[in-house]
A protein has these predicted regions:
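Helix-loop boundary and gating motifs at the non-cytosolic
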Residues: 2-61, 221-233
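Central cavity-lining transmembrane alpha-helices of secondary-active solute carriers
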Residues: 54-73, 241-253
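Conserved MFS/SLC helix-loop-helix module at the cytosolic interface between two early adjacent transmembrane helices
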Residues: 66-98
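Cytoplasmic membrane-interface "Motif A"-like loop-to-helix N-cap segments
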Residues: 77-89, 259-272
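C-terminal ends and interior cores of transmembrane alpha-helices
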Residues: 89-107, 272-284
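Intracellular juxtamembrane helix-capping segments at the cytosolic ends
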Residues: 124-138, 296-311
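C-terminal transmembrane helical hairpin of 12-TM major facilitator-type secondary transporters
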Residues: 265-302
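A late C-terminal transmembrane helix in Major Facilitator Superfamily
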Residues: 311-342
Length: 384
């Protein structure tokens, strides 16, 4: 049941991101993406000014990601997530179902801005409330986190590329996922044992400022460095889809790799190799995409390590990591970062992730070196 729930919530992640991003692109009026311009790049067609487009995208990012720490704190304090999960999924689905037949929005105005805020709120609430159920399955393993966060990238790409066509279908998928979650008994009773365990667990510090600062720094510079990495070819439709698939594969693999080889291995091997591929092989699509996959293996790792930094406020930690990743990516769009600096930032990010467990008084469950022998794991199971 738990594995099915994680898989369903991952699919819901795809549907939610596709719905909200599709609305953003319908709102800003991008008519076509992927057509080659005279310069050989992607052609964008919009009746709105660049400032208006930037304001809409920035507002969405700040609300959808910036509110997650506050939603996470609410979930941690109230120890409830199911009502938020269903409200966000059904809310986004219903709003999309109303917008499409009404041919809305027609432009950027007060009403469309209000709907944008609503979709952003749904996105923020969904990520944390759905994440709460995945976090409950990630007390001693990182893999569920990787599976959950992986498909969001695919949803963003589909919403970005096919905004007018997929809005209604994406909203319907949100509602369908909510119905499926009801069938799988995704309720607050399922979370109660998790909250009880972390509530009575002995911890040396409720908030580890040193590891939290390292992880916040790591996700910020990773977002900054990753967004600034050069790409030596046109961002056409096929590439956007392939990049999303590789991103999803990397995030999913990162959790399993951390469980098998330790979080330090992912940080100190995958990130440096990814930086080399993305910088020095950026003109070769296959190698660049491989680097992109390796680059994203660290995402579930940083999330999982943040739970040791805030052991009783894990949903808050989840939101904090998401918020600072967004801030790094947004900052990268506002400044010019040379390739060598982006390369260095990715390496620094890996070092910060690897260092975080060593300055934390609350040690993570996953081995930092190599997995335990299978025989030892079987003997542990017999003792239980």
């Amino acid at each position: 049941m738990a594995k099915l729930r994680v898989a369903l919530l991952s699919a819901a992640h795809l549907a939610m991101d596709m719905t909200t991003v599709a609305f953003v692109y319908v709102l800003i009026g991008v008519r076509e993406f992927g057509a080659l311009s005279e310069a050989g790049g992607a052609a964008w067609y919009s009746p709105h000014s660049a400032a208006a487009i930037a304001a809409c995208v920035l507002a969405y990012d700040l609300l959808a990601f910036g509110l997650q720490p506050f939603v996470g704190a609410f979930v941690d304090l109230k120890k409830r997530a199911a009502p938020l999960l269903y409200a966000s999924l059904f809310g986004a689905g219903l709003c999309a179902a109303v917008c499409v037949p009404c041919d809305f929005p027609q432009g950027i105005g007060a009403a469309s801005a209000a709907i944008l805020v609503f979709f952003s709120l749904c996105n923020a609430v969904f990520h944390v409330s759905a994440g709460a159920f995945v976090i409950a399955e990630s007390e001693k393993k990182c893999a569920p986190l990787g599976v959950f966060v992986s498909l969001g990238a695919v949803g963003v790409a589909l919403g970005r590329l096919y905004a007018p066509a997929v809005l209604f279908a994406a909203g319907a998928c949100c509602a369908a996922c909510a119905a499926g979650a009801l069938f799988l008994k995704t309720n607050d009773q399922a979370l109660a044992p998790h909250f009880e365990r972390i509530g009575r667990a002995e911890v040396k510090e409720n908030v580890g400022l040193a590891p939290l600062a390292l992880l916040v720094f790591a996700v910020f510079v990773r977002g900054l460095g990753g967004a600034a990495m050069p790409s030596g070819y046109a961002a056409d439709e096929l590439y956007v889809l392939l990049a999303a698939i590789c991103t999803a594969a990397g995030k999913a693999a990162g959790g399993f790799l951390a469980d098998a080889f330790g979080t330090k291995s992912v940080a100190l091997i995958c990130l440096p190799v990814s930086a080399c591929l993305m910088l020095f092989a950026n003109g070769i699509p296959a190698l660049y995409l491989a680097g992109l996959a390796l680059f994203n293996t660290s995402m579930p790792v940083t999330l999982w390590l943040s739970f040791a930094a805030m052991p009783r406020m894990r949903n808050t930690a989840f939101g904090v990591m998401a918020c600072f990743l967004m801030l790094g990516s947004v900052f990268a769009m506002s400044v010019s970062v040379p390739g060598w600096l982006a390369f260095a930032l990715v390496l620094i990010s890996g070092a910060a992730i690897a260092a975080a467990p060593h300055v934390s008084k609350n040690k993570p469950e996953i081995s930092e070196n190599m997995p335990r022998p299978r025989k030892a794991r079987k003997e542990e199971g017999k003792d239980v």
